[in-house]
Amino acid sequence: MGISILSGILSSLSSIAQDPSPPPTNPPALPRHFIATVRSPSSVAKVESALSPLVKPSVSTLRVLQSTSNVSAAAEADIILLGCKPYMVSGLLSASGMKDALTVKHTEGHARSQKIIISICAGVTVPDLERVLREDVGLSADNLPIVVRAMPNTASKIRESMTVINTVDPPLPDTVTELLTWIFERIGEVVYLPPHLMDICTSLCASGTAFFALMMEAAADGGVAMGLPRAEANRMAAQTMRGAAGLVLEGEHPAILREKVSTPGGCTIGGLLVLEEGGVRAAVARAVREATVVASLLGGGGAKNVNGTRH
């Protein structure tokens, strides 16, 4: 996910540099210098290979380091994107030296701006992170970074993500909201929703990519079974799904769209009835519900099972 997000942002910065009149909605200070930390030398090589072609020296810089450099990277950064597994959050943030790296420094009576931690860890809430920062890291309330929870998806890589950002009370400063919006609009669409909806958003927006991929694959399988070459079947299924999504994003209700294509006695209504007989609608809805519960459990939420499919 981190590679996808950085890919989108670096590509966008390059596009802005080529545009003589960037849009006025850009925040005053765009992020231009990036440090990525990964766990192994092989991962360093993989990330460098994926991202280096997107770096324009006149626009942005990128360093890829091993996770042994997490503390120094955090100390240097103004914005920290936390993209580890949920169970790793406490250990990563409580590493030796991290407290000092995250602490607001005071110089000649002037405090440096708070760091911003953006978490994309499924199931980990803002209160969870703030509790780790206070209890495990040892930061005082005065030194807590600004903590933001966001949930993008893997389509960040092609700047087609659907990102949901957790609203907080009291609201974030306008400058922070503008910066967050700018960052995540570089990789797709952005909405702000309250905390109690975030696990649902994780299911629908992040896990949903896999759900829709399965449906697309199934449609292509049907075409292949009837004689289509695999490559053409995959392309047709993907483009048809993109077209349907585009119509809905333009304001067409899915039920109306379905009805418009279903002529009396036609092939579409026949196929739709097979889908209904197979319980596709209920199965997809149930998958979203189940993934929502699992997302809440990843962060230690302890939500009850809603579908009875796990023990």
Predicted regions and their residues:
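Mobile beta-alpha loop/short-helix "lid" or hinge segments that flank ligand
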Residues: I5, I9, R149-I158, R186-D199, ...
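NAD(P)+-binding Rossmann beta1-loop-alpha1 motif at the extreme N-terminus of oxidoreductases
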Residues: M1-E76, E160-S161, V224-A225
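A general structural signal for well-ordered alpha-helical segments in protein cores
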Residues: G2, V44, A77, V89, ...
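NAD(P)-dependent Rossmann-like dehydrogenase/reductase catalytic/cofactor-binding core
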Residues: R235-H311
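A short glycine-threonine-serine/GTX helix/turn-capping micro-motif
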Residues: T202-A210, R258
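Small-residue helix-packing motif on alpha-helices
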Residues: F34, V44, A73, V89, ...
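Internal alpha-helical scaffold of NAD(P)-dependent oxidoreductase catalytic cores
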Residues: A50, D128-I146, M162-C201, F211-E250, ...
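Rossmann-like NAD(P)(H) cofactor-binding subdomain of soluble oxidoreductases
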Residues: I35, P41-L51, R63-I165
